[in-house]
Each structure stands twice: as C-alpha cells, then as structure tokens.
Regions:
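Residue-level preference for the first positions of well-ordered beta-strands
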Residues: 1, 68-69, 99-101
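N-terminal phosphate/diphosphate-binding loop that engages ATP/GTP or pyrophosphate donors
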Residues: 1-44, 50
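Conserved beta-strand scaffold positions in the cores of enzyme catalytic domains, especially
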Residues: 2, 71, 120-123
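Low-complexity, flexible helical/coil segments
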Residues: 11, 36-42, 54-58, 104-111, ...
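Short, surface-exposed linear patches
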Residues: 23-27, 39-43, 74, 92-95, ...
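Short, surface-exposed, polar/charged, turn-prone segments marking secondary-structure boundaries
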Residues: 28-33, 46-49, 98-101, 128-132
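Phosphate-binding/switch loop-helix module in NTP-utilizing enzymes
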Residues: 37-82, 88-90
C-alpha cells in the first residue's frame, strides 16, 4: 500500500507526474512544469495541493487495513524544507509497527536520515534491493 509518482518526460526531462494509489490504481495529477491555476510552485514544478490531500487520505486508509508495507514516492527537497509530505513523514518516522519504503534521491539520503532520525542500517540502495526483499520475505 502507499503511492508512487510515475512521471512524464519531454525532451529527456521530467515534465509532469501523477500520484498513484498502489492499492486501487487511482491517479491524481501531482506536478507539472507548466503553471496550473491554484497549484503551488516549488523549484521548477507546480504542485497540486489536492494531490497532497488525497495522498494523506490514502495513507490514513492504509493504517486502517494494517498494511504489510507502506510505500512513499518520493521524499525530496520539498519535504526537507518542511513542505510536501513532511508532516506525514514526521508521523510515519515515529511508527515502528508498519514496514515503510521511502524513495529518496541518493544525493539527499543523509539529510533525510538526519531529519527523521532514521538509522543508517535502514537504508537500501537500488543495488541492494535484493537484501531488502529478503529482509521482508519469510
């Protein structure tokens, strides 16, 4: 359970992305390089406030169903500056009852670890995903 943010690309650069609920497949526009009415600008993207509200609802519904794994895509610079999913991550970082997989860019992993007091041994790189799978599989 949780969500991913599949992207669209234009001229080799990410130009837009949607928030997708992993349980239902439901999607909502999340970000775009083109200005959208009512959306909030952060760096080169405009973000849909409704997508953050919907994502929060999806996360809350996950906890009602006791998920085996909660996926958050992605934790990025916006969250490090207190926006985006930051408040949700504050809560999730204190929850040790649900296994969580946070997608984080390599260049900001250390900042994310510090901000949410995550131990180094909880970090898995794309190259070590087999170790992650073995950890959660019986």
């Amino acid at each position: 359970m949780g969500f991913l943010c599949p992207g669209s690309f234009s001229e080799g650069k990410r130009s837009a992305f949607t928030l997708m609920d992993l349980e239902t497949g439901s999607r909502i526009p999340m970000g775009d390089v083109n200005e959208q009415k009512g959306w909030v600008k952060f760096r080169r993207f405009f973000f849909n406030p409704e997508a953050f509200i919907q994502g929060e609802l999806w996360i809350q519904s996950c906890f009602k169903k006791d998920p085996g794994l909660l996926v958050i895509d992605e934790v990025g610079p916006m969250e490090l500056e207190g926006g985006g999913w930051a408040k949700t991550l504050d809560t999730l970082a204190q929850n040790s009852t649900v296994a969580q997989l946070w997608m984080v860019r390599q260049e900001i992993v250390q900042e994310v670890l510090r901000k949410w007091s995550i131990p180094e041994d909880q970090v898995y790189t794309a190259e070590s995903i087999d170790n992650l799978i073995q950890r959660w599989m019986p």
